[in-house]
Amino acid sequence: MPEWVSNRLKPGGRIGADPTLVSSAAWERWAKKLAENSVYLLPIRNNLVDFIWGSSQPSYSKHDAHVWPIEYAGKTWQEKVAAVRTMVEGHGCDAMVVTSLDEIAWLLNIRGRDIPFSPVLRAYVVLTKSQISMYVPPNKLDLSVQRQLRTDNCYSAFCVRLQNYTSIWEDLRTLSQVWKKVLLPAEDEFSQGVSRAIYTAIPVDKRHVAQSPIMTLKSEKNPTEKEGMRKAHIRDATAFCDFMAYLEDKMADGENWDELKVAHYLDKFRREQNLNRGISFRTIVAFGPHAAWPHYVPSNVTSLSVDRSSILLIDSGGHYLDGTTDVSRTFHLGSPSDREVDIYTRVLMGCIDLAMLQFPHYLPIRNIDVLARAHLWQAGVDYRHSTGHGVGVYGSVHESPININWQSKDAKMFRVGYFFTEEPGFYQEGQFGMRLENVLEVVQNNFNSTHGPFLSFRIITLIPFEPKLIDRSRLSPQQKRWLNDYYSRIRSEVGPELRRLPNMKGYHWMMDRTQPFLVDCDSSAAVSLNHVFLLVLLLSLGLA
């Protein structure tokens, strides 16, 4: 954007932006880039787009927020507030402004429907040692939420004072006069940090910009949240397997399907699951050349017919009261080419190698990226997107602080209780694409090491891979054993749920695709995991 503007304005030109809608971090980047051409970025009070809309501007969501029950949250909101206050005090601050919507939802154990596919509500929270103020549109909180937050007669440190949503900026200017330091959340991966308007409402000498302590606490799931995520993924796998059996059965009967129809029915199967609260993002169903677009979403105009001639990629997920899912699977309903089998097998091997990793706790998150890419690199191919991201619990499907990308400058490390995706892929424009995505849980390893704690991953996505796209001769004995263990878990954990359904088609579909692999000791075609892990360690030490 700054480059485009700079090319159209003469030196000395000025451009305005609404500081309530632009993060402070983005504002500073824009201002710096524009200044290189003597163009100046200025805050404007009246939003031009709002003015153009006039009376025809769509209204905000009128859906009420609702309580997220303690049996899924695992901790009371008062416990969370106490923990955040301790961390804020550790920063030497006596107040914090919370702007990230998923952080507000997590902190207060509430959920909303203000943003499509995200269970959050529009609000701000100002937290001090003795008060909690929530800036929220009128009539947004139903009585159950108000009772939980003790909004009536609020005179203690553990009740919430409700304020007008648009009063936040003026209140901050007033309140900051008595504060010594104010913690303002910094930009971090999928969190934009505070807006420019909030940043400038706090005097310069009182600003303390740092990683949000709520982000840190939220990303390390508690025991209740961990168990909920595991259970949600079992139900999600049940819906997915049952749908795929239904799709293949209908296509065998000659029924016509297109991308949009596949997405519609998969969403329907998910919504029928217990505790489901909708989909976690717009379902991606991409057939043939459309699968070469990583973020393609079908529409009435673009939807292709689905048949047996090419690759079918499905990237989808759901929200449940006890968890959030995100899964990608690639299928071929006909006879795949040798090229398609080769690429799919390489993508799968990357998934397995990453999932098998055991590593010291000090290994930076970014460095595991090479495990997912190594087998593709051997063929001279790569993918441009990151390999993975954090996942919330009935929250944001893209959760900070995890972003797995070897090019990242961030040196954050994994913590027990993180949930994240691994999603290597391949995209050949005009022909086909494929991606495999699983959610993994970070767990403590039982190594008794002099180098401190070791960590490993537990896969919680429980959906079979496409057997006709796997070249078994390329898999190492380790990889085959991992697949056998994985398929055994699918049968034992998802199988009982599929058997409870009115028909057994989903169960038979799952059983068909989880046949065990014969493990030999002569798979020399596969790259040794040890060699790839050595590369990871070299990268972490800056020696490669």
In which residue ranges do the predicted regions lie?
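A short, hydrophobic C-terminal helix/tail in secreted or cell-surface proteins
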Residues: 526-534
